[in-house]
A protein has these predicted regions:
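Non-catalytic, usually N-terminal nucleic-acid engagement modules in DNA/RNA processing proteins
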Residues: 1-169
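Glycine-rich phosphate/ribose-binding loops and adjacent secondary-structure elements
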Residues: 2-3, 168-238
């Protein structure tokens, strides 16, 4: 891999465009256009902790050809030294990575630690200010042990937060996560509602504990209920 290789930026009018180049049933091969180049899908996005880099992001790009990665905007926002550097120089310089950067918003931290200290609009604005390629709204995490009514409230609150998150993002591509816990009906409700809004990508939210518990039958039901109700012209992230 050429160590001097840099991504070729897409035209601004193409940002967020998803081209499906081949398909087999619900499976798709595509090209997703971003500010930092075109990425092919499906693809694996490594997760980078900005405080602990096991493999440097630059090495991922130079040596392994990784086109895109994920880092956490909430972690950056919470640590003043990272926050100041990201606001001054941008997230790409902060982690030394020229490719596509997607950021999470702190939703998973709310699942792990019980709460986050940042607001819905604030975290989207921060992601915009540090120059991410694909930002994520602050959705409400649905745990596998939650009741139907609890999960439905989480789905409804996420849908309520969505319009102001999109407005705050402006021209930045935004993830619209699909929640719904273990309930296919609520996954479908979330997918229909989020698909009707101007998101660029739809992550399937709340599935980490399900995969950790190896509940793959439940995972398959979640994916079926979600994908069958999502717009086919957008990528899905899981």
């Amino acid at each position: 891999m050429d160590p001097n290789r840099e991504p070729e930026p897409c035209r601004p009018q193409d940002w967020g465009k998803f081209e499906i180049t081949n398909r087999d049933g619900a499976a798709r091969i595509g090209k997703f256009h971003t500010r930092h180049g075109v990425v092919t899908t499906p693809m694996l996005l490594p997760v980078v902790n900005p405080n602990l880099r096991t493999i440097e992001p630059r090495e991922m790009w130079d040596k392994y050809g990784i086109q895109a990665l994920i880092t956490n905007s909430y972690v950056i926002w919470k640590h003043e030294n990272l926050k100041d550097s990201a606001l001054a120089d941008g997230v790409h310089k902060l982690i030394d990575y020229p490719g596509v950067i997607m950021t999470d918003s702190g939703t998973f931290q709310s699942y792990v630690y019980g709460d986050v200290e940042v607001g819905v609009e604030e975290i989207v604005q921060f992601q915009k200010d540090i120059g991410v390629d694909i930002a994520t709204m602050l959705d409400v995490f649905s745990r596998p042990d939650m009741t139907y009514s609890q999960v439905e409230r989480a789905v409804d609150e996420t849908l309520e937060r969505a319009p102001i998150s999109i407005e705050t993002a402006g021209g930045v591509m935004l993830n619209g996560p699909i929640q719904g816990g273990l309930f296919p009906k609520l996954r479908a409700k979330s997918a229909v509602g989020m698909s009707a809004l101007d998101f660029s990508v739809h992550p399937i939210g709340g599935i980490v504990p399900i995969m950790e518990q190896q509940k793959y039958r439940d995972l398959a039901k979640i994916m079926l209920a979600s994908k069958s109700n999502l717009s086919p012209n957008r990528p899905v992230h899981m």
